[in-house]
Amino acid sequence: MVFSNGDCYRGGFEDDKLEGSGYLMLASGVIFKGEFHADSYSPVGKLLYPNGDIYYGQHKQFVKEGVGKMVYLDGSVYEGTWESDRKNLSGRMQYAESGDVYVGEFIDGKRSGRGRYYSTAEITIYDGEWSNDRRQGEGTILNENGEISSGEFRAD
């Protein structure tokens, strides 16, 4: 079924209404896979993006909102809280290329607030404050030799 706005639905119907499992292909190219009931879609489902990224979780009108997991085309994975399509509050990001992991707070999609970063290349752990994806404020680094360095970091 094709709608006047260009969206296209494939799935179950009951009494001429969207019902059961289905796919809604949005005019933007995003595909929602989930459950439908009486022409309404579930606030939890799978969103497939034209660039290959895949999101599983809560959404509001196909915008990531609430708790969810994003698997990026490059293999990186974010699991945590979303607000208005951005990583916000707390989550865990694993970077595919490096294998590094960040666990902590996010603001507007960037590491900001308190967080811990595990670096596989440097074999270090940074635990401290972040701002705009950079180490900023009080923090501690533990290196591969077990040495601990604490101090103030500035846009590092």
Model-found features: residue ranges?
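Generic detector of low-complexity/intrinsically disordered segments
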Residues: 26-28, 49, 91
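Acidic/polar residues in short coil/turn loops that connect beta-strands
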Residues: 5, 28, 51, 74, ...
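Short, charged helix-to-loop "capping" segments that act as catalytic/coupling loops
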Residues: 44, 90-99, 118-124
